[in-house]
Structure formats: structure tokens, C-alpha cells
Amino acid sequence: MSDDFKINDATYSGTKEVDQNLKFDTNLLQDWMHEYIPNCESISSVEQFKGGQSNPTYKILTKTGAYVLRRKPPGKLLPKAHAVDREYKVISALEETDVPVPKTFGLCDDHDVVGTPFFMMEFVEGKVFWDHLLPSCSKTERAQIYRDKNRVIAALHGVDYSSVGLAVSYTHLTLPTRLPV
């Protein structure tokens, strides 16, 4: 791989101060959190994750825990783009399966809270690898990571999507019963 295309994990990992155009009133979020997250204490800090391209993602710290907020970006968007509601539905549905996902706390479509629809989930400590070749890992670490990835893929394949509420209907794709000759 050319050095021009190497991805530096540190560049995209971790958090930063929230971009000015993505800030929101933490008092309104705090009120929402008190309603949806049991025993939630006051927000002590809000940071924005560095990585990602689509939906702004924040680390919310309180005295009792760390949470992640994913929201639609502000501004004019394509109708089906940035579907945080779909992300929430899938993650929530997988909570009771063998697929490791964070616990979700709620989906909010009230624009008055943070300006756009969002959902909250627990923060899970870990490392994000932006380069799939895992150059910062030893051979042993890479082998373990790939085994874990395969285990999770197998767990996904084992999910009965209908029973967890993720069945998809394709009735809108039916072909005409009579084709022109």
C-alpha cells in the first residue's frame, strides 16, 4: 500500500472539542437524559468523535457513566439519508442476541432537544481500527482481532431477523403480472 493511502488510526480515533456548527444546548439534552436513562447524573462534558463521515457522534460524560449520542447533521439532507432511526432500530433489535452491541436508551425525533433527531447508547471502551490491515498490531493481536470479527459475523448470520423485528418486506418490488409483448 502506498504511503499516500495509509490511514493513521490516531488521526481519526478519539475525541475533540465539538465543532462550532454542531454544538447544542446541553441543558435540553440533560432533561431528555434524565427521562430516558435510569439514575443519570448531570452532564460533565460533551466531546465529538474525530472519525466518521456521516452522522455527527458525541461522547457524553456524566458522573455515573459515559454515553454516545448519534444525530443527523443539521441542514438540508436527502430524504432517506442519515437514518439514525434505522441505526437505532437495528442496534436495539440486536441487544438480545449474541451480536455484541451497546445498550440503547432511546430515539428522539424532537428537534428542540439537540436540533436534529438522535439516539443515545452506552459508550463501550475499545479501539477503532481505521486501517483494515491493522499495521499497529502484532501478528498475534491481528489473529485475535480477525477471529473476533469472524465470531461476530457468524453471530450476525445466526440472527433470526424476523423474530427480532428486522424483517424487510419487498412487496413494493413486485413485478407486473402481465408483461408487454
Place the predicted regions along the sequence by residue.
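Membrane-targeting and insertion segments and their boundary/processing signals
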Residues: 2-7, 31, 65, 123, ...
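Single conserved hydrophobic/aromatic residue that forms the stacking wall/gate
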Residues: 172-181
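Juxta-kinase regulatory segment immediately upstream of eukaryotic protein kinase catalytic domains
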Residues: 3-38
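Secondary-structure boundary/capping signal
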Residues: 37-44, 179
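ATP-binding pocket architecture of kinase catalytic cores
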Residues: 44-173
